Amino acid sequence: MEKVLVIVGPTAVGKTALSIALAKKFNGEIISGDSMQVYRSLDIGTAKVTETEKEGIPHYLIDCREVSETYSAADFQKEGRQKIKEITEKGKLPIIVGGTGLYIQSLLYDFQLGSREIDDSPEIRETYNLFAEEKGNQALWLLLQQKDPLAANSIHFNNRKKVIRALEVFDKTGYSILTPKEKPARLYDYYLLGLETDRALLYERINQRVDQMMTEGLLEEAKQMFQQPHAQAAQGIGYKEFFPYFSGEQSLEMAVETVKQQSRRYAKRQLTWFRNRMAAHWWNLVQQPTDLPKLEKEVAEWLQQKESE
């Protein structure tokens, strides 16, 4: 079973810097586990690692899709597993870094995405089809997001067939279409590091990051996505919040505040996901940076162990 180091946590908590430090120390290469960093030209709003920050460490699953293309958890699962294999075969340590919980969970476990088998229900499908015809695909997808956010986050809102199937499964079973019937098997000997910090401090860091993004040109990236509003990438935080401003319906100041608010809410959801669904070793390096040697020691001990039982 291949060893994989995984670094998770909310936005603006220092995952990138830690991943570079550990890659240098343990001969690692990095796989991005972020659903938005796959898109070319969306660098600022996705907080993509810069060439300078990489310090020569190879990074994968970044800049591998055009903004007009879709990208799903199933895509990440397939491509991520291939990269783990390639990195391991080079004698290096695969390091997964990111904040998209479903992506990382589907990669580490034998998670059969979208495979829950139930009988078709034409009546339910017809009801939702009529709803979509009247209200639109976006409204249908938002309905799924309310009922089953796990599935909604893995399906593009314009894929009406998949959205309806997910709603159908949830209505008939009470479970997400992504919920396996049995506990999925673990595919890797992984060590999961979680980064967190005081909530007030985290929110302050998020606000500062958004201000810095604005200085670096976030508005231009958002304008690019405003011209492609139906693209999956346009739904990312930091882009769609500016659409009312571009339409003349809202001030720039209010749009920026909305980005900050949505980013804070997303960070809260990220923390909830990882705490509830994945058993991580949690560290607060923002407030306790001197804990880094202790963290590195634990990783070194894990690497020396034989395959985990």
UniProtKB/Swiss-Prot annotation:
Indicate the annotated site residue(s) for Interaction with substrate tRNA.
Answer: T100, R125
Q: What is the protein name given in its UniProt record? A: tRNA dimethylallyltransferase
Cofactor(s) the record lists: Mg(2+)
Quaternary structure, from the entry: Monomer.
Q: Where does ATP bind?
A: G9, P10, T11, A12, V13, G14, K15, T16
One function term, GO molecular function aspect: tRNA dimethylallyltransferase activity
Q: Which Pfam families match?
A: IPPT
Gene source species: Enterococcus faecalis (strain ATCC 700802 / V583)
Q: In the Enzyme Commission scheme, what number(s) does this protein have?
A: 2.5.1.75
The record's listing under Gene3D superfamilies reads:
1.10.20.140, P-loop containing nucleotide triphosphate hydrolases
Keyword flag Nucleotidyltransferase = no
Region span, Interaction with substrate tRNA: 34-37
Ribosomal protein among keywords: no
Q: Name one GO biological process term.
A: tRNA modification
